[in-house]
Amino acid sequence: EKNTSYGVDAQRTWEIHPRATAVVGMDLVHEIYAKLPTSASREDKRYARNNWGLFGQWEQRFDARNTGIIGLRETWTTGAARGQNYSNLSASAQWLHKLDAKSSAYLNITQSFVMPTFSQMYPKNDMQKAAPDLKPQKGINYEIGWKANHGGHTWKAALFHVNIKDNITAKVNTGRTEYQYTNEDFRNTGIEVSDEIRGKDG
C-alpha cells in the first residue's frame, strides 16, 4: 500500500481599520491511495480525490476589553471514487473579554467537519479491515472559560460540551486480532483545569 498527498494553501490578511482584521484563504490537497501488487496478492487498486477549502475570518476589537471573532469555512471534495464527494459549510464564533491586564474570560462555539483519510478507509496492514463507506464526521463544540497569567504560570479553567455525529473511531476485534474504522455518534461534557509553567528561558 502507498498513501501520497500533496497540496497548496494560501491566505491573506487585511487590516481593515485599527479595530478590525480580515483573513481570507484557500487550500487544496490531492490524495492518492494505491494497493500495490505483492507476492501474496496481485490486486492493484488505486483511488484519488481532491480536498478543497475556502475560509474567511473577521476579528473585531470593540474596545480595550472586548474582542469578537467569527469565521466561515466551506469544504468539499471532487474526483472521489463511487461518487463519494461531500460538501460542508461550518462556522465558528469567539468572544474574548479581558478582566484585567493578566486575565480574561472567553466563549467559543465551533462547528467541525473532518473527512476520513484513505489510510482509515483502506487497509494499510494485514490487521486492518477496509471501511470504504466511512463517512465524514460533523460536530459542534461549546466552551466557556477563564485564563490568567501570573508569575510564570498560565492558568486555565473551562467548561465544555462536544457533540459529534459519525465520529471516526477504530473498533478492535480482539477475537480475530483485527480492527476497522467506523462511524459512531459521540458526546462529551466536562471541566478542564490546567496550569502551564514557563521556565526562565521560555
Where are these regions (language model features)?
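Short beta-strand motif preference
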Residues: 24, 144-146
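Surface-exposed extracellular loop regions of Gram-negative outer-membrane beta-barrel proteins
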Residues: 32-34, 78, 83, 88, ...
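Face-selective signature of the C-terminal outer-membrane beta-barrel domain
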Residues: 1-86, 92, 96-98, 153-159, ...
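Outer membrane beta-barrel strand-and-loop segments of large Gram-negative receptors
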Residues: 5-12, 47, 51-55, 131-135, ...
